[in-house]
Amino acid sequence: MVSRPRSPSAFPAPWWGQQPGGPGPAKRLRLEEPAGPEPRAAPSLEDPAGDPAVDALTSIVVLAAGCALRVPLDDVDLVLEPAPTSILRVSLGGHTLILIPEVLLSSVDERSGAQHDSSAGLEVDVFLGAVREDVVVELEFCASVPEIAAQEEAYEEDADPEFPELRMDSPTGSAAGLYPSSRSMFIPYREGPIPEPCALAPNPSSERRSPRPIFDLEFRLLEPVPSSPLQPLPPSPCVGSPGPHARSPLPERPPCKARRRLFQA
């Protein structure tokens, strides 16, 4: 009597037990068992969720020699001034400020391939080689306080519409009793002669302003003043033209005796 082998589909049995040369059950079981939770990968620098510092704004400010950066806060004004040979980094909430003196940038540009051991120069190279999307470069121009005050005062004087600039003649430059009916004066940003100057209203701030130079180029068409005792001289008579005061011609004299004898001979 011959027995037929059982169908594998009717009675499922592990086939690795019937194959003598197959892999062991332990290895197969380890390959087929459900995998456990994978370890969480460490956040990379490109992952914005893993590194919250990427969202912060970073500004690089280049300061000239002897200048400082004023940052207005809620209650006070913060003045930041780095040392001439160092770089200052300040974090204000989500904003990071990096202050670089202009001297360090000029020293980095002048290296031209020469090697030096300055740590400040290396730090400048690191900041300048940062990613452009994460760094906002801001160039800051500063000046000393007296220069700024002088410039503001000059701007206020130039932009004051209530007190237009007028150039009046000096009393010593004109003749007594005569006044010019048309005058040409030097006025910046204005061309052509101007009418007679009018009196200005008293200005309380005019005392502090320095007197400005007055330039009179020429006087033309001098006319006499009716109330002045000085009157212009009459025009001089022209030579060769008879005028009302010209002398009458002399009567002809008879020729002398010698002259009569000469013509009679």
From Swiss-Prot:
Please list the residue ranges that the record marks as compositionally biased, kind Low complexity: 1-18
Region described as Disordered: spans on this chain:
1-49, 226-265
Give the InterPro entries listed for this entry: PRR23
Q: Where is the composition biased (Pro residues)?
A: 226-237
Q: Where is the composition biased (Basic residues)?
A: 256-265
What family, per the record? Answer: Belongs to the PRR23 family.
A Pfam cross-reference name: DUF2476
Q: Which residues form a coiled coil?
A: none
Instruction: Tell me what this protein is called.
Output: Proline-rich protein 23B
Which residue spans traverse the membrane?
none
